[in-house]
Amino acid sequence: MPASNSCSPPGGDHKPPPPPPSHPSPSPTPSYPPPPNNGGGYYPPPPDNTSHTPPPPSSTPPNNGGGGNDGGSGNTGGGNSDDGSDGGHSICPSGLYSSAQCCSTDVLGIADLNCKPPSRTPKDGSDFAKICSNTGSEARCCVIPVAGQALLCEDVVGAN
């Protein structure tokens, strides 16, 4: 190949390359995690509590001593009931063991079988024991009963 075809002559016409095409600037790439102004990356973003009122305070659940008017025993028309006028005295502590029950079978002092609520609302621990003993059962404070079977229970304070 001849040398005259492979190179431009020195000092001859040499044109600079054309400028690159003009393109719009790309938008900024989002950073991860998202910046704090859009929730800080937690989905969903935290609630805006500035325009909301707080929820009302919770109330204390009722205890086992109130509202005991059970209607009595058949033909007497309510002669043996407690109307709850003693201020709702609680026989069992609030919390897990809060259900007053008369249980006929005790297993190792913690599990009880054949449990039923007392026939009327007891006035105190000794009254609770008397109500249950009338049916041949024992006064116990239990977790919420499930079909009257296999309850976790503890002794009633003041039932002796």
UniProtKB/Swiss-Prot annotation:
Q: Which cysteines are joined by disulfide bonds?
A: 92-141, 102-132, 103-115, 142-153
Q: Write out the entry's keywords from A to Z.
A: Cell wall, Disulfide bond, Secreted
- Please indicate which superkingdom the organism of origin belongs to: Eukaryota
Q: How does it assemble?
A: Homodimer. Homodimers further self-assemble to form highly ordered films at water-air interfaces through intermolecular interactions.
Q: What does this protein do?
A: Aerial growth, conidiation, and dispersal of filamentous fungi in the environment rely upon a capability of their secreting small amphipathic proteins called hydrophobins (HPBs) with low sequence identity. Class I can self-assemble into an outermost layer of rodlet bundles on aerial cell surfaces, conferring cellular hydrophobicity that supports fungal growth, development and dispersal; whereas Class II form highly ordered films at water-air interfaces through intermolecular interactions but contribute nothing to the rodlet structure.
Remaining remarks: HBF2-8 is the only class II hydrophobin gene for which no expression has been detected and that does not contain a signal peptide sequence, thus it likely corresponds to a pseudogene.
Q: Which family does it belong to?
A: Belongs to the cerato-ulmin hydrophobin family.
The name this protein carries in UniProt is: Class II hydrophobin 8
Q: What is the lineage of its organism?
A: Eukaryota, Fungi, Dikarya, Ascomycota, Pezizomycotina
